[in-house]
Swiss-Prot record:
Species name: Staphylococcus epidermidis (strain ATCC 35984 / DSM 28319 / BCRC 17069 / CCUG 31568 / BM 3577 / RP62A)
Gene name tied to this protein: spxH
Similarity comment text for this entry: Belongs to the SpxH family.
Alphabetized UniProt keyword annotations: Cytoplasm
Any GO CC annotation of this UniProt entry: cytoplasm
Function according to Swiss-Prot or TrEMBL: Adapter protein required for efficient degradation of Spx by ClpXP under non-stress conditions. Interaction with Spx stabilizes Spx and exposes the C-terminus of Spx for recognition and proteolysis by ClpXP.
CDD domains in alphabetical order: DsbA_FrnE_like (cd03025)
Entry keyword Transmembrane: no
Name of protein: ClpXP adapter protein SpxH
Length: 265
């Protein structure tokens, strides 16, 4: 297994003053413009489904100079700076913020679009975030302070690239396990099982239509990751949902997407 991991290091989190909140806590450092980070989000979704009782994932936009410069270059104001927008979204809850960044990545990666205020606005509303509160929060100085905290965490964990995951057990004095880059799904399940030290009963994924309804927009690759069905069978089930007017197929240069026509649950 060690040979399969190109870079896997132990890092302590004692100096970051972070408290464990679950059996296994996973810190996910991402670049919103990275295709590998986009692909990893599907793997993290599957981990959350199967190991829901055993893990908690915390997403942190990698506050490196390279990523923040890219966020600034893609923006015309604070409103469409995705780094600041993500921090403002976090003030209304991490779940909503994660939904927001998922929707944003679905916009900017497959379509290769630049970020606009309209795009931010649509994703904010679709993520269930209060738009007026979001606009007010964007003006607060504490967003910059929050980015500085993320930078401190990234430096303490010696994060040098995105995606990077750092796994921690519930013992705050134990070192974390850092995994840089993108790997097959079984690598991450191996790590979780090793850290737990006991067999884990995995949950089954929800019905296909419920998953798409919750996510609103998903890639074909994500669905193949979540369900592990033969592609022919998955296409057959998606066709059924299309005929039932529950989903619609979208085609972009980066691949095939499926959009829910059902109200968000």
């Amino acid at each position: 297994m060690a040979e399969e991991l190109r870079i896997m290091e132990n890092k302590s989190r004692e100096d970051t003053n972070l408290s464990p909140v679950s059996k296994i806590e996973i810190y996910s450092f991402f670049d919103p413009f990275s295709k590998d980070c986009f692909k990893l989000s599907a793997i993290l979704s599957k981990l959350r489904i199967e190991y829901n009782k055993y893990i908690k994932v915390r997403h942190i936009l990698n506050p490196s100079l390279k990523v923040l410069t890219k966020c600034q270059a893609q923006s015309t104001s604070d409103f469409d700076n995705i780094a600041l927008a993500y921090k403002a979204a976090e003030l209304q809850g991490r779940i909503r913020a994660e939904r927001f960044i998922h929707l944003m990545q679905n916009e900017i990666i497959p379509k290769r679009d630049i970020i606009t205020e309209d795009m931010i606005s649509d994703c904010i509303n679709n993520a269930g975030i209060d738009y007026q509160v979001f606009k007010e929060d964007l003006q607060k100085d504490k967003l910059t302070d929050s980015l500085k905290v993320d930078l401190h965490i990234a430096r303490e964990m010696e994060i040098e690239q995105a995606p990077s995951l750092v796994f921690f057990s519930e013992n705050v004095h134990e070192e974390g396990l850092k995994v840089e880059g993108l790997y097959p799904y079984h690598i991450y399940t191996y790590i979780i099982n090793e850290l737990m030290g006991q067999p884990i009963e995995k949950n089954l994924p929800p019905k296909l239509e419920y998953y798409i309804q919750k996510k609103q927009l998903v890639t074909m690759e994500e669905l193949l990751t979540i369900y592990e069905w033969p592609e022919k069978l998955l296409n057959k089930e998606l066709k059924k949902l299309t005929l039932q007017q529950k989903v619609e197929k979208l085609q972009y240069p980066e691949g095939e997407f499926w959009k829910s026509k059902m109200p968000q649950c």
